[in-house]
Design a protein with these regions (language model features):
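Interhelical loop/hinge segments that connect adjacent transmembrane helices in multipass membrane
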Residues: 1-8, 185-189, 203-246, 289, ...
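Membrane-interface helix-capping segments at transmembrane helix termini in multi-pass transporters
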Residues: 2, 6, 39-45, 77-87, ...
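Signature of the first transmembrane helix
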Residues: 7-72, 101-105, 170-171, 230-260, ...
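Hydrophobic alpha-helical transmembrane segments
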Residues: 18, 160-210, 230-231
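Alpha-helical transmembrane segments of polytopic membrane transporters and translocases
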Residues: 43-59, 88-92, 191, 198, ...
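Helix-loop junctions and terminal segments of transmembrane helices
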Residues: 60-76, 152, 211-212, 268, ...
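Alpha-helical transmembrane segments of multi-pass membrane transport and lipid-handling proteins
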Residues: 88-115, 176, 201, 306-358
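Membrane-interface junctions at transmembrane-helix termini in multi-pass inner-membrane proteins
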Residues: 138-163, 175, 186, 207, ...
Length: 379
C-alpha cells in the first residue's frame, strides 16, 4: 500500500508538471486564437468541432472500457493477457473510426449544411473545418488503446512529455495563424488535424518500443471483444447522456442564437478544461491503482483510494475555482482582449457543475473496476 501511494504521488507530480506547462500555453493560445479568428469564426470552430464530437457517443464508451480492461489484466499479474486484449482493442477502435467516418460524411454533412446557423459567406470554411475535425476525431479514436496502455502501465513521464510536445506544436500553430494570409479558420482546423496525426504516431512508436504487449498481430479475439462490448453496452447510456448534454446544448445554442454565443461557451470551457486539469491529472494517477487493487482482491485498499480521491479532487477544484467564481468579469477582462457576451454566466455555471462532478470521478473508476456499471449508468 505504501509503495502504491508513493507511485501515485510521483505520477501526480509528473502530471501536474505537464498540466501547469500546458495550461499556461493553452490559456495564452486561446487568447491569441480568439483575437486572430474573431468571435464569429472562433464560435464556428467550437460548434463544428463540438458537432463532430457528438459522434463520440459511439467511441466514448470504448475509451473507458479499454483503460479498465488493460489495467485489470496488468493487475492480474502473470495470469493477465494484455497482448491479445490490446490487439482486439486496436481493431475495435479502427472499426469504430470507420463507422464515425460514414455517419459524419452522410447524416453529419446533411445536418451541418441544412439545419445549423452560420453566416452565408462562411459555409465553404465551415465544410473544410468539418472535414479536418473528422480527421482529428478519428485519429484520436484510433489512439485510445495506445493512450490507455501508457496510463495502465503508469508511464506518466512519457504521457507528460508527449503532452508538452503537443501543446508546443499548438503554440507554433498560433504563430503560423498570426502571420498567415490565407483563411485563418481553415488553416487552424488543418494544422490541428496535422498535430493530431503527429501525436498519434508518437504514441504508437512509444508503445511499440517500450511495451512488448502492445504489438498488434491483427487477430481479433472474440472472447475479449465480447467481454468489452458487454461492459460497453451499459456504459453507452452514460455516453449518450454526457454527449447530448455537452454537445447538444452547443448545437441548440447555435440554431437559436448563432456562433457568437458558441464562442462565449467555448471560452468558458477553455477555462474549465484548464482547471479540470488539476482534478483529472490527480485522478489519472489514481485510476490504474484503483483497478489493479480490485483485480488483486485488495478491496479495502481500493475503497481508501476512492474516498481520498473524491475528497481531494473536490478540494483542489474548489481552491482554484472560488476566486474565479467571485471575480469572473475582472479575470476575463484581464485575460482576453475582447470578452464575448454571456461568457461570465457560462463560466460560473460550468464551474459549479464541475465542482459537483468532481466528487464522482474515482467512484466511477471503482464501478468500472468491478464491471457492475448498469445501475450507475441508469442513474
Amino acid at each position: 500500500m505504501q509503495q502504491n501511494n508513493k507511485r501515485i504521488a510521483k505520477n501526480t507530480l509528473l502530471l501536474y508538471f505537464r498540466m501547469l506547462f500546458t495550461m499556461a500555453i493553452s490559456l495564452y493560445t486561446s487568447r491569441v486564437v480568439l483575437a486572430t479568428l474573431g468571435i464569429e469564426d472562433f464560435g464556428i470552430y467550437n460548434v463544428v468541432g463540438g458537432f463532430v464530437a457528438m459522434f463520440s457517443v459511439i467511441s466514448g464508451s470504448m475509451t473507458s472500457a479499454t483503460q479498465r480492461f488493460i489495467s485489470y489484466e496488468i493487475g492480474k499479474g502473470e495470469e493477465g493477457n494484455v497482448s491479445t486484449l490490446f490487439t482486439t482493442a486496436v481493431i475495435i477502435h479502427i472499426f469504430l473510426g470507420g463507422i464515425v467516418l460514414i455517419l459524419a460524411e452522410t447524416i453529419g454533412l446533411w445536418f451541418l449544411n441544412t439545419q445549423m446557423n452560420f453566416p452565408e459567406n462562411r459555409y465553404v470554411a465551415v465544410n473544410w473545418v468539418f472535414q479536418f475535425s473528422i480527421i482529428t476525431f478519428i485519429v484520436n479514436v484510433i489512439s485510445v488503446p495506445y493512450n490507455a496502455a501508457i496510463i495502465a502501465y503508469e508511464r506518466m513521464k512519457a504521457f507528460a512529455y508527449v503532452s508538452i510536445i503537443e501543446v508546443t506544436l499548438k503554440l507554433l500553430i498560433v504563430y503560423l495563424l498570426v502571420i498567415s494570409s490565407v483563411d485563418k479558420l481553415i488553416l487552424y482546423a488543418f494544422l490541428l488535424a496535422l498535430v493530431a496525426v503527429t501525436i498519434r504516431l508518437v504514441y504508437g512508436l512509444y508503445c511499440k518500443r517500450y511495451f512488448t504487449d502492445c504489438h498488434c498481430n491483427w487477430i481479433y479475439h472474440k472472447s475479449h471483444g465480447a467481454e468489452m462490448f458487454s461492459f460497453v453496452s451499459w456504459n453507452l447510456i452514460g455516453s449518450v447522456a454526457s454527449v447530448t448534454k455537452e454537445q447538444g446544448i452547443n448545437i441548440v445554442l447555435n440554431i437559436f442564437f448563432g456562433a457568437s454565443v458558441n464562442a462565449a461557451r467555448g471560452i468558458a470551457y477553455q477555462v474549465l478544461n484548464a482547471l479540470n486539469g488539476f482534478v483529472n491529472n490527480f485522478q489519472l494517477a489514481m485510476n490504474p491503482q484503483i483497478v489493479k487493487s480490485y483485480a488483486a482482491g485488495e478491496k479495502e485498499a481500493m475503497f481508501q483510494l476512492v474516498y481520498k480521491g473524491s475528497k481531494f479532487s473536490y478540494l483542489m477544484l474548489l481552491l482554484f475555482s472560488l476566486p474565479i467564481l467571485i471575480e469572473t468579469p475582472f479575470i476575463l477582462n484581464l485575460w482576453l482582449e475582447e470578452v464575448p457576451q454571456y461568457t461570465t454566466i457560462f463560466l460560473r455555471l460550468v464551474l459549479i457543475t464541475a465542482l459537483i462532478d468532481s466528487l464522482s470521478g474515482t467512484l466511477i473508476t471503482s464501478m468500472h473496476a468491478s464491471g457492475r456499471v448498469r445501475n450507475y449508468q441508469l442513474i
